[in-house]
Amino acid sequence: MASLIYRQLLTNSYSVDLHDEIEQIGSEKTQNVTVNPGPFAQTRYAPVNWGHGEINDSTTVEPILDGPYQPTTFTPPIDYWILINSNTNGVVYESTNNSDFWTAVVAVEPHVNPVDRQYTVFGENKQFNVRNDSDKWKFLEMFRSSSQNEFYNRRTLTSHTKLVGILKYGGRIWTFHGETPRATTDSSNTANLNDISIIVHSEFYIIPRSQESKCNEYINNGLPPIQNTRNVVPLSLSSRSIQYKRAQVNEDITISKTSLWKEMQYNSDIIIRFKFGNSIVKLGGLGYKWSEISFKAANYQYNYLRDGEQVTAHTTCSVNGVNNFSYNGGSLPTDFSVSRYEVIKENSYVYVDYWDDSKAFRNMVYVRSLAANLNSVKCTGGSYNFSLPVGAWPVMNGGAVSLHFAGVTLSTQFTDFVSLNSLRFRFSLTVDEPSFSILRTRTVNLYGLPAANPNNGNEYYEISGRFSLISLVPTNDDYQTPIMNSVTVRQDLERQLTDLREEFNSLSQEIAMSQLIDLALLPLDMFSMFSGIKSTIDLTKSMATSVMKKFRKSKLATSISEMTNSLSDAASSASRSVSIRSNISTISNLTNVSNDVSNVTNSLNDISTQTSTISKKLRLREMITQTEGMSFDDISAAVLKTKIDMSTQIGKNTLPDIVTEASEKFIPKRSYRILKDDEVMEINTEGKVFAYKIDTLNEVPFDVNKFAELVTNSPVISAIIDFKTLKNLNDNYGITRIEALNLIKSNPNVLRNFINQNNPIIRNRIEQLILQCKL
C-alpha cells in the first residue's frame, strides 16, 4: 500500500552518498574574515545608531545681513534695504528709473571747507559745491526729477559708520538722513518704483525690510565686528541668485551631503512589463468538472533602453480583491461545472513590483518623497477551451479591464536566490469592453477579466512612465547600506517552503476521494512517488537521496529504534505492576494499571493526558504489523503523492522538507484500535478511549490491563472510520455485522463502495481526513 513509501524511507534513510555529506559539510563551513576599514575610518564597526545625516526641509531661513557683495549694477528687489559700505569719498551710488527719479549720493570726508568738486553721475560731468565741518563723514543726496533739471541737495546724512541705505517700498524710495547715532528714514515719491535701478560703487549688503530695526542699528552703530575682518570677501551678486532648475526625466541629483551620508534624488523614466499568472485545476472523475481557475503571482524579467543605456528589470504581478464566480451545469457526473473561477473588476487591484539594476535601487532602504506617474493600459482576456471527453467544448472568452495608476510604495520581490528592494505600483481597475462569457452555457455578458486566459497570448503588458524618489545613501559610492530584506540561501529556502506549504494546503479541496483510495492501495515506491515532478531519472534518484538524508532526522525515524523495547517494557509493566508506573520513554505511559477493575473510570483521566505519546507508539506498531486494511499513512502518502503531482512549486530543494513534514504533520488527529474476538478497543489523540461490541456497537468498560496485554500481541489497526462515525452510520442507515467488521478493519473495498454510493457520513469522514493533511 501507499505507506510502503514511509517504510522504505525508514529502511534506507541511513544510506547517504559520500558526495552529499561532503556537500553538506562544505555548505555549513564558516570562516572568520577581518576587513581593513581603510585610513579614513574611525572605528572597525558599523555605527550602532544609524543617523540620517543632513535633512532638507521646506523652510527657507533668510539671513539678516546678506553680503557683502561686489560693486555692480542691478534692479533692487522691493522690500529689501540696500546697505552700502562707503570706504572713500566720491560717488557712493546712482539710482534712476529714467522718468521721474534721479538721485546720486556723494561722500565727503570730515573737515572740508566749501569747495566745488567734479563728479561723474549718470554719464555726465557735474560740479557740486560741498563742505563738511564735522568730525564725521557726510553723504549728500543729490536729486532731480527730470533729465533736464539740475541736481540739488535734498537730504544729508552725517555718519561715523560710513553706511548708507536705500529701500524700495510702498511706491516710494526710502533713505536715511540726520546724524548718527540718531539718523532716521525719509522717503521720496515716484510714479515708477519697479523700474528703479542702482549703480553701486562700493561693497554692499542686502537686508529684508522685516529686519529694518537691524538696518537702523547698523546705520547708527556700525556693522558687527566680524564683517570688518580681512576674512570676509565680497562676492558677486550673481552668487545670490537661485537657479531654478527643473529635474530631468533621468537624473541623479545630490541634494545634501555630510561626511557619512548624502541624499540623492533619482528621477527615472521606466518601462514596466508584466504578465498575469493563473492556475487551472481540474477535478478528478470523468473529466467534466473543474475545481478552480485562479490568479497567481507571476515574475517577468526583461531588458530595455533608457537614454541609450540598457536596463535589466524584474517585475512581479499580483492581484487583490478578486471576485469568485462559479458555474454548475447540473448534478450528473457528466454535467459541466466550474466550482470557482476568479474575475478582477472595479473593486480589485493589480500590484506590480518593479526593480531594475540602476543606482536608484542599489541602496533603497531609507527613502522619502516617493512619487510616480504612469500611463494606463488595457488588458483583454483570451479564450480557454474546457476540453470535455465527449460533446461540444464550452469556451470561456473575452473580458477586459483597464489599469489606472493609483499609488506607489516600497516593497520586496523574491526571486529564486535573492530578495530585491522594489517599488510596488498599485493600479485601480475599470471594466471595459468586451464582456466575457462561457460559450454553450448560460454565462453571458459578464464584465471583468477572468483568470482563464488573462494574457490573451501576449508575452507581457507594457506601461511607461516615470518615478522620483529621494534616498539616503552612503557618501562613498563604494559602500552599500545593509539591505533589510536580504536573505541567505537558507532563508530563501524557508520562503520557498512557506509558499509551497500554502500551495499544498490549498490543494486539499481538489483531491477526488475515489482516486485517493485507489492511489492509497498502490505500493508507492521512491520512483513512483517522485515521478510527478518534471525531471529526469537521474534527478529523481538525487531527490530520493536528499529525501532519505532529511527523513533520517525526523521524529518518525528516531522513534523506530526504540519501539520494540518500549512495547516489551510496556507488556511486562502491565503484567507485573499493581501500582502506578510512569516511564516517559516506554508505552507504559498508556495506563495506570490497577488490580481493581472498578477504578478503570478514574484511570481514564490519566490516559487522556498521555495520548500524544500513545498514538506515536501505536503508529509505529501498526507499520510493523501491517494488515490488509487501509492505514492513516496510506491516506497520508496518497495525499502527498497527489499534491506533489499537482504542485507547481515543488523542487529538489523543497521536496525533502515537505516529505518529512508530511510524515509528521499529516492527519494529526488519529484513532487506533485493537480487535479481540467480538470486542474492539479504540484510543484517539484527543484523549478518549472506547471499548464496544462489533454486533451492537454498544460501549463496554475499557479494560486497561487487557489493552496493555493486547497491544504487544495483536495487530494495531488505523481507525479510518472511528467509533463515533460508525455509531452515526449505524443509527442513521443501519449496517450489518459484516459491514461493521469491514469498516472496523478499514477494508478499502468496503470504503470505496460507500464512497461510490455517495454515503454522506463516510464521505464526510474521508474529507475531514484529507483536510487534516496540512503542513
Curated annotation (Swiss-Prot):
Bridged cysteine pairs (disulfide): C317-C379
Alphabetical UniProt keywords: Capsid protein, Coiled coil, Disulfide bond, Hemagglutinin, Host cell membrane, Host cytoplasm, Host cytoskeleton, Host endoplasmic reticulum, Host membrane, Host-virus interaction, Membrane, Outer capsid protein, Viral attachment to host cell, Viral penetration into host cytoplasm, Viral penetration via permeabilization of host membrane, Virion, Virus entry into host cell
Xref: SUPFAM superfamilies: Concanavalin A-like lectins/glucanases, VP4 membrane interaction domain
The keyword Disulfide bond is annotated on this UniProt entry: yes
Stretch list, region Spike foot: 509-775
Family: Belongs to the rotavirus VP4 family.
Identification of the protein by name: Outer capsid protein VP4
